[in-house]
Amino acid sequence: MATTLGSGERWTQAYIDAIRRNKYPEDKRPDSHDPCGCCNCMKAQKEKKSENEWNQTRQGEGNATYTEEQLRGVQRIKKCRNYYDILGVSHNASDEELKKAYKKLALKFHPDKNCAPGATEAFKAIGNAFAVLSNPDKRLRYDEYGDEQVTFTVPRARSYHYYKDFEADISPEELFNVFFGGHFPSGNIHMFSNVTDDSQYYRRRHRHERTQTHKREEDKSQTPYSAFVQLLPVLVIVTISVITQLLAANPPYSLFYKSTLGYTISRETQNLQVPYFVDKNFDKAYRGASLRDLEKTIEKDYIDYIQTSCWKEKQQKSELTNLAGLYRDERLRQKAESLKLENCAKLSKLIGLRRAG
């Protein structure tokens, strides 16, 4: 029994020593959890790893030596009130000037080379300043809403505010490796707020996507209406044209018999004996001078019509003659010769009557 108790005491003492050395060796830490693979969990795991790296670096700072110049440099960074002062550039600095300033300061304040108190926070501030100012959109927002506050605190407390809503999604070490590891990106570094705002960012993005989808659906539903609006001017013009034709007064005569319009009574002009047709009310409306003027108009219209018909007859006769000669077709030649130019004969008669009159 004594031997068993001694073994239990030794086991208990070993367990206590393990807890002191490692803290929670068998169970997981209270604030840890298995990442589920979602964006927020992966982000939290990444930042926890980054915080552990900063803690190890800060522990090394207390045991290393530093120069007075390095300490003054850290103090200068802490006193800066905006990102331009941190990098030591003007507000209209170009991308090349920003890169040059960052490279110089990053090498100077990297924790491996600068062990002054606060060098880690200064290095992080330098990286965050460059990451913001190198992005055109973030820089524009920073110039408009910046100059609020710059607070250097312990990363573990998660209250470092290198300008609210202007924290980089890339760590200072990753940014440093980008520059000095031979993999400088061709584009700008994209920025987001801290991890606590990621859910808000994705909610805003999904809300924006839903809004765009709803807008597209509205556009689809409005497509027939939009098409109708576009065709409306054409419809108005056609409608006006039809109404105008319907409301326009019918001419008092016709060169041809048209029972549907009432032109069933045959007449002839007094001068050239041109036939035309009128309705039953014609005699009441036209007498004397008005009738003579109207008949002049009728004769002119009739001559124009006969001239057009004569030209068509000559054109047809000429085409048949040419085809007969081209194909040496006797049948076409005979048809061309037998074709009578009746309207041309009428035209000649009318011209003779006009000359005689």
Swiss-Prot record:
The chain crosses the membrane at residues 227-247. Its main location: endoplasmic reticulum. SUPFAM superfamilies: Chaperone J-domain. InterPro entries: DnaJ_domain, DnaJ_domain_CS, DnaJ_subfamily_B/C, DUF1977_DnaJ-like, J_dom_sf. It comes from the Eukaryota. Keywords: Chaperone, Endoplasmic reticulum, Membrane, Transmembrane, Transmembrane helix. It holds the Pfam family DnaJ. It is found in: Endoplasmic reticulum membrane. GO terms for cellular component: endoplasmic reticulum membrane. It is a single-pass membrane protein. Residues 82-146 form the J domain. PANTHER family: AT29763P-RELATED, DNAJ HOMOLOG SUBFAMILY C MEMBER 18. This is DnaJ homolog subfamily C member 18. It comes from Mus musculus (Mouse).
